[in-house]
């Protein structure tokens, strides 16, 4: 039952045409990778659940109950597969439409990010260069102290610590200075990127084409369609579960009745 619940929880994210993600020859979109991962997980849960059912039926309690769960499990698996096939095209259409309708915005934001990246890259390179120089300078100052320690006695450890502490503090202070300088240099570009994003979203709201409100309306429409498409398939799944639950109930009641009779006879 746990496997069934897990399967239902994720089958809405996957389509019927998904393939294993490690078998792809062509580059995949993010949606395809997510769907393939979910499909692999669902298959693993389904196979693992069938193994547990088989082990239970082989046990003494399973033989006594005689629920024939394995037959019902295979039937249930077919029902779940059918459900995925029915809902798969609807979810695929939803993701395709969402990706298509936000393509322009994503392209514009990628362009903005690339422009800002090119502007700040010199500052990042300069920061990295200065940091490497500071580390090298620190290493040069510390190296003689290490030699002194190897050549000296144990009592010089305290002296070494006293000499290293100022050097460590100096490195920390110089690094903090460089970080503060970098932060000040990048601040205008961070503000610029934030303003660009705000402008893109504002233009999207005011445009005569696809707006954020339209995205929300279309998403709601697709989700409503998905819900309507899923109702018959979910009802089929519920009907497939009924024999399993009824068989379990009958078998359990038989065991309870038998145990009650034995207790009364004693």
From Swiss-Prot:
Family listed: Belongs to the apolipoprotein A1/A4/E family.
SUPFAM superfamilies given in the database record: Apolipoprotein A-I
Molecular function GO terms recorded: cholesterol transfer activity; phosphatidylcholine-sterol O-acyltransferase activator activity; phospholipid binding; protein homodimerization activity
Keyword Transmembrane set for record: no
Post-translational note: Glycosylated. Palmitoylated.
Sequence repeats by residue range: 67-88, 89-110, 111-121, 122-143, 144-165, 166-187, 188-209, 210-231, 232-242, 243-266
Region (10 X approximate tandem repeats): 67-266
Organism listed in the record: Acinonyx jubatus (Cheetah)
Key words, A-Z: Cholesterol metabolism, Glycoprotein, HDL, Lipid metabolism, Lipid transport, Lipoprotein, Oxidation, Palmitate, Phosphoprotein, Repeat, Secreted, Signal, Steroid metabolism, Sterol metabolism, Transport
Name of protein: Apolipoprotein A-I
Record GO biological process: acylglycerol homeostasis; cholesterol efflux; cholesterol metabolic process; lipoprotein metabolic process; phospholipid efflux; positive regulation of cholesterol efflux; positive regulation of phagocytosis; positive regulation of phospholipid efflux
Taxonomic placement: Eukaryota, Metazoa, Chordata, Craniata, Vertebrata
Function: Participates in the reverse transport of cholesterol from tissues to the liver for excretion by promoting cholesterol efflux from tissues and by acting as a cofactor for the lecithin cholesterol acyltransferase (LCAT). As part of the SPAP complex, activates spermatozoa motility.
């Amino acid at each position: 039952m746990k496997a069934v619940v897990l399967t239902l929880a994720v089958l809405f994210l996957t389509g019927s045409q998904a393939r294993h993600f490690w078998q792809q020859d062509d580059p995949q979109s993010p949606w395809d990778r997510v769907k393939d991962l979910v499909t692999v997980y669902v298959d693993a849960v389904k196979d693992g659940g069938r193994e547990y059912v088989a082990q239970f039926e082989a046990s003494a309690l399973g033989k006594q109950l005689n629920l024939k769960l394995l037959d019902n499990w295979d039937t249930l698996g077919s029902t779940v597969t059918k459900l995925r096939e029915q809902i798969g095209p609807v979810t695929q259409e939803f993701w395709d439409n969402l990706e298509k309708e936000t393509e322009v915005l994503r392209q514009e934001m990628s362009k903005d990010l690339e422009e800002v990246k090119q502007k700040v890259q010199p500052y990042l390179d300069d920061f990295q260069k200065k940091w490497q120089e500071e580390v090298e300078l620190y290493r040069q100052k510390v190296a003689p102290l290490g030699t002194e320690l190897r050549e000296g006695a144990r009592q010089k450890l305290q002296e070494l610590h006293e000499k290293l502490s100022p050097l460590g503090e100096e490195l920390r202070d110089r690094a903090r200075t460089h970080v503060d300088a970098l932060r000040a240099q990048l601040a205008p570009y961070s503000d610029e990127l934030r303003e660009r994003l705000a402008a893109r979203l504002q233009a999207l709201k005011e445009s005569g084409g696809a707006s954020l409100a339209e995205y929300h309306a279309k998403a709601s429409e697709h989700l409503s369609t998905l819900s309507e498409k899923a109702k018959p398939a979910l009802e089929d799944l519920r009907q497939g579960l009924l024999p399993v639950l009824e068989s379990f109930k009958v078998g359990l009641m038989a065991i309870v009745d038998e145990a009650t009779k034995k207790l009364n006879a004693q």
